[in-house]
Amino acid sequence: MQNPSNMNSTTTTSTSTMLSSGFSFLRIMPELQTLEILLATSIFIAIHSIRQSKKQGLAVWPFIGMLPSLLLALRHDMYEWITKVLNERGGTFAFKGPWFTNLQCVVTSDPRNLEHLLKTKFTSFPKGPYFRNTVQDLLGDGIFSADDETWRKQRKAASLEFHSAEFRSLTARSLVELVHSRLLPVLESARQTNTPVDLQDVLLRLTFDNVCMLAFGIDPGCLRPGLPDIPFAHAFEEATEATIIRFVTPTAIWKALRFADLSNERRLRRSLRQVDEFAYNVIDTRKKELQLEEASGTNTRSDLLTVFMRLRDENDQPYSDKFLRDICVNFILAGRDTSSVALAWFFWLLNKNPEVEAKIVDEIRRIVKERGESEKEGEELIFRPEEVKKMEYLQAALSEALRLYPSVPVDHKEVVEDEVFPDGTVLKKGTKVIYAMYSMGRMESIWGKDCREYKPERWLRDGRFMSESAYKFTAFNGGPRLCLGKDFAYYQMKFAASSILYRYHVKVVDKHPIAPKLALTMYMKYGLKVTLTKRD
């Protein structure tokens, strides 16, 4: 028979064990609940993502929106990703970033929408505070980021200068000097030594020297023999690259990094210090030169900086050094990158389409033959302005390159009042709008089923070049902000391209990687390594 005391002891032990187990279960209950919540949340997010993917062609995640898709695109080719989404969504889609960021916008490639925002409702779609704040450190209040009266004032003065006889003469003279005294000797040296050369780098140096002559009235010498490293040119490129990173970084984060002087913001600050030092030194020197010219009664300069120095603001006061700096930096950005980058893609496309190159060379030779005079021994052939104008097929080939690879692949606006696009997209006040020029060149609805093919003939009517609507072909923008330097850019590209193609066949190095770089303008990420052979 069991002892009662033993029974009590056993009962007590069992009770203690049960209580202990109960308390242990209670302790792990919160962990189990947390696990259940996490599992349920994960299932919800997965189902939500699948539904959104089927519905919109792009996953929209709770809290973080479409950020994962954007990050994947940034690792590969963001421009092709945008094009794919636009094609799937009929030409317009709303990008939803994380709820706590500024990465919310409407992206469009519909020509009707572009005409609406660039012309019809121009005043309702300024660059806006978001764009201005993002590029302020680099571009200041220059023409690319300015709105309203500040923009109109610069636009009017620059327009008068661009159409003046003095400026046109300066552009033609400086281009002849740079192409024949620097560009061609650099290429000939590479040919003689059979050395591959980065043509994009060479062209960037050409246009940088050219635009600095026009904007500042100085020659930085980037294209001199040996291709020297020019601190200002290097700093300018660093600053533009660092600025573009802000557009894919939440505003609060890049501003915090700027305050702490860390990461990309430190790089931007250091490069801008060199840019500003160069610009302000040039401005100070020019002021002294103009004082001497006024004292002697001479007036020989026609560069952009000098023109604005002689103007007065609304209070009849000279413009500030900061204002002058902003103007020149903006025009250098426009003049340096756009033409050179376009030419780099143009030569790459010719390498892939030799039949187009043959037609261009035939056109150039025919125009030279029309001179009716033989070249003198040792005299270098220099194309005349009227001959460059006759190069219609070359202009078509350059336009086709710009259609597929626009120098500015995307641009930005911000709506200041509630609007509705012609395609029915509703825009609330403050909405950021991205118009994708790169994608427009790859839309069957705009250019037909052969939109991805390189066909200069689509620009010709009975052998004559015919331009397209600025809202279909937006490489030079449209409406009141149509590029002031469009005619100069075409002349510069045609003169440089014809001077090269008349003398050399340009071959891209085998297996050279080609990809666009994420930047304000459409650089080739790895440059364009080429070799040159003399034409017969």
Per-region residue spans from a language model:
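Cytochrome P450
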Residues: 2-44, 96-106, 166-177, 187-213, ...
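N-terminal membrane-proximal hinge/A-helix region immediately C-terminal to the signal-anchor transmembrane segment
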Residues: 2-8, 16-153, 174-185, 271-274, ...
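Conserved cytochrome P450 K-helix E-x-x-R motif and the immediately C-terminal K′/meander segment
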Residues: 69-93, 274-281, 379-425
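Cytochrome P450 heme-thiolate "Cys pocket" and heme-binding signature region
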Residues: 160, 459-493, 519
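Conserved cytochrome P450 catalytic core segment spanning the I/J/K helices
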Residues: 163-165, 239-245, 267-343, 369-387, ...
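Central I-helix of cytochrome P450 enzymes
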Residues: 207, 211, 216, 271, ...
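Cytochrome P450 heme-binding "Cys pocket" and the immediately downstream C-terminal segment
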Residues: 354-356, 433, 486-522
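Conserved cytochrome P450 K-helix/beta-meander segment immediately N-terminal to the heme-binding cysteine loop
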Residues: 405, 435-464
